[in-house]
């Protein structure tokens, strides 16, 4: 007996798992371990950038304009400083840019309107190290002109808040000086892709993906805005500590031509763990990122199949969280 077996329109049986645009990189996407959370969360955003570039879609650019953080547009090739589609382009992960894949909305904004949705962003100490290096690379010898360094800086005990808090006017002056140089020095620094869900549900919104790029100077301004550099403070929070880290790194670059980031971060801990520099909730980030494309991301969920290719989704290993399983198992309560 003969049977008619319809031919499948698409098959990835003979196609290796891969991500759009990442044909040459230091990651092998045919291996399951390459699809683990830590690597996928940086690989996918870069692939998304390549996909958007192939469609002629500009990324959102958070940069300094008239002393304020503004959201404009930037070509992906200007972010990477190379043509993403070029067959000779090689993507070396863990090098040039910080990448922070963020969910939209977070728990502080999920009950608000879409226009007020925001993403929590968690910044690790390494990102502040990269920020200091980026500023030093761009400014070179002129970095010293931006620095407000007191004469007694070499004699300070940086681990002691009572000695560091009087430095706040100098830190404030330095960060403001850097922001005032935005027209000549700012460059793309941090990639913040957003993925949007329907409120706090696990379902993707129809328009669910977009890319926001922070310039290095805009990120300095962001740190400045969320820090409390008032000399009357009684303690140093994470945001303010981050401003201190950045200032100390830049001071050491000017004075010694280098800095020891491990020593600075350990010395300036102020009784707070160093696992992260700081975290800012969606209520805070929305103020700086608010835009039409934050409210309605430009890439549709139906396009994800054009980015994750060759059955790569089957190699993903999402975290198993008990609260998420309970939340998605409504039948348990019937």
Swiss-Prot record:
A P subtype restriction enzyme that recognizes the double-stranded sequence 5'-GRCGYC-3'; the cleavage site is unknown. This is Probable type II restriction enzyme HindVP. GO terms for biological process: DNA restriction-modification system. The keyword Nuclease applies. The keyword Hydrolase applies. It catalyses: Endonucleolytic cleavage of DNA to give specific double-stranded fragments with terminal 5'-phosphates. InterPro entries: Restrct_endonuc_II_HindVP (IPR019044). Keywords: Endonuclease, Hydrolase, Nuclease, Restriction system. Pfam families: RE_HindVP. It is an enzyme of class 3 (hydrolase). It comes from Haemophilus influenzae (strain ATCC 51907 / DSM 11121 / KW20 / Rd). GO terms for molecular function: DNA binding; type II site-specific deoxyribonuclease activity.
